[in-house]
């Protein structure tokens, strides 16, 4: 590991300008559970790490009548245990609780979880010069692709590793992006980019930009949500497949639905055809198995991951079934 500088920023302007001045060999750091791993593994070389830990308001949780504001440095353990989140945004609390181990959740942050890099073993190995690292080959295309994408992938078959992003997508969250000039906001679905749009990045952040907070609109009184995650080891693992579902139910009828998938696509994956199919249905008449199959109708599995098609369909069916039974 090569030596690098560490700077503690105290303002957004300072953080942004320091990052721009040292680009492309600068990175922001919050909890560091992902980026330090990349550096230690020899995947990433940096000249400077710019810490966001000193920014005002970055660790705040603000609940109001209009919704929830989460600072990007709020730890995952706080999200999982905050009573206002557990009661009003259960899918988010469940997603945060599912991440890694208690030790990592105590350090890992919301912003870091959203901006973490792929866990693809070809990308993470210094032995493979894959597309994600500027090479010419996706080595997962032909073999060794048990954990890779079945939806939304063409040339590069990574899956996005974030759990909380999937829940936030179902909850219609907004991401705030900051730089030295100010802030801009966007739906969380627009924050992530697939390899087909930008092979070398997973989100829209430009040099000098970072995420200071995330906003979630307050759900109506008839809204219920859930996050489910399938993984090989219950103790600590990334998702083989995950699903977040938010349903608004009035008079036994689903008036609004949002379903998001994780562990199966290069980005947290919306399934609008499922949202449309659920909306307007009486909860007693929902065919959850058909809904599950609809969620994976566009799946294109690789040589070793066809199991994800069945698994994901089952996960969607279970999640919807749980909510309509509440």
Can you describe what each PLM-predicted range is?
Residues 1-326:
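C-terminal structural segment of proteins
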